[in-house]
């Protein structure tokens, strides 16, 4: 099932694709924004919880401001199949970005495409340390709706976040739901001074 604007036969709800089968989606890329697609075959929540989803980005014709871009798919892992998440993460692997911080440069625009595809829990959130972000709900408007360091999202919601770090250092990002962060949904940005990066490379 594709979120967005398209004909009914491209909605992906009634066209079940069996093992070895295929279905080709064709639609105009509209509207501008960050959109979701996922399996819509019952049991839907189990299929989504086990990874049958993705995201696609439609940029405005005039483009967006140059930025270092990344995507976060916020999800959970039900490892014992009891309908409750045992671990949480961004891009599937719990604690990954805590052990492998994302390297960025100071005073450089960062654009994060954030999708909450979490099942079995009603809401998720994103908290950024050391700076604030402008956020664009679903990215369908080019004017930000707020400036904050905390964002709460229901299931299926998407946001585009834009921010930069003024000072070098290691900065955490995580779910502000303590259970989620303690079970894997936590990471860090490693902001390096751009002049130091240049001198290190030459």
Model-identified regions with their sequence ranges:
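Copper-binding active sites and cupredoxin-like electron-transfer domains
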Residues: 1-202
């Amino acid at each position: 099932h594709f979120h967005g604007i398209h004909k009914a036969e491209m909605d992906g709800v009634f066209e079940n694709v069996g093992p070895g089968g295929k279905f080709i989606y064709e639609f105009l890329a509209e509207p501008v924004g960050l959109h979701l697609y996922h399996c819509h075959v019952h049991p839907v929540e189990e299929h989504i919880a086990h990874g049958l989803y993705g995201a696609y980005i439609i940029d405005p014709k005039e483009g967006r401001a140059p930025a270092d871009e990344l995507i976060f798919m916020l999800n959970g892992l039900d490892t014992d199949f009891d309908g409750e998440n045992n671990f949480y993460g961004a891009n599937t692997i719990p604690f990954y970005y805590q052990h492998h911080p994302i390297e960025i440069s100071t005073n450089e625009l960062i654009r994060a495409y954030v999708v909450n595809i979490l099942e079995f829990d009603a809401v998720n959130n994103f908290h950024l340390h050391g700076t604030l972000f402008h956020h664009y709900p679903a990215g369908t408007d080019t004017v930000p709706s707020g400036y904050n360091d905390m964002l709460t999202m229901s299931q299926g919601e998407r946001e585009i976040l834009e921010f930069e770090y003024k000072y070098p250092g290691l900065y955490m990002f995580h779910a502000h739901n303590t259970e989620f962060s303690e079970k894997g949904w936590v990471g860090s940005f490693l902001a390096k001074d751009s002049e130091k990066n240049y001198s290190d490379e030459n």
